[in-house]
């Protein structure tokens, strides 16, 4: 089995948490739907192709560096009589993510080639957050094996974490574990769609030791929980 590792360090990143309004909060990592959407755009797939990728690919992420959390506040004027509200948007400055994908060999190879020569410009989250490579060898295909591991750097499911876990920080700039509702899929009805969420725990700058080993994929020996 083969997998794809994509290492990115954008100048800024914003992954909107969709269940709030006046505060445009951000996940500290690319959610599954965002990361797979990035591949779909690079390949040049229409909406139907994106839906197929969501069904086919598995995804995991390690936050190597959360970056600096910043905020910008703006007011949108619709008309003189409309109520005016300030809106605050959360951004992460120069984060560093390692994205992991697993799926059919031909799909992994196609995604690899597309990121090197994309149909549409890849971006992370909103259209202002362009994808910047973390280095020269930022996208590569590696061997993948199934395994079990209790010590992880990747985002983990909430249910696994709450069975018992401890966080071991190894860097001063770290994120303590926090639970999020991550969009992992969409349910389509007519021309509309709604997100399907899964509770996950994200952290950075250290390891999480789970009480029980979890089923993972090993990307060149690196254990990653996949969604």
Enumerate the language-model features and the residues they cover.
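N-terminal, Lys/Arg- and Ser/Thr-rich interaction peptides
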Residues: 1-20
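Residue-level preference for alpha-helix termini and adjacent loops
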Residues: 11-14, 26-28, 90-91
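Internal, well-folded beta-alpha domain core
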Residues: 64-227
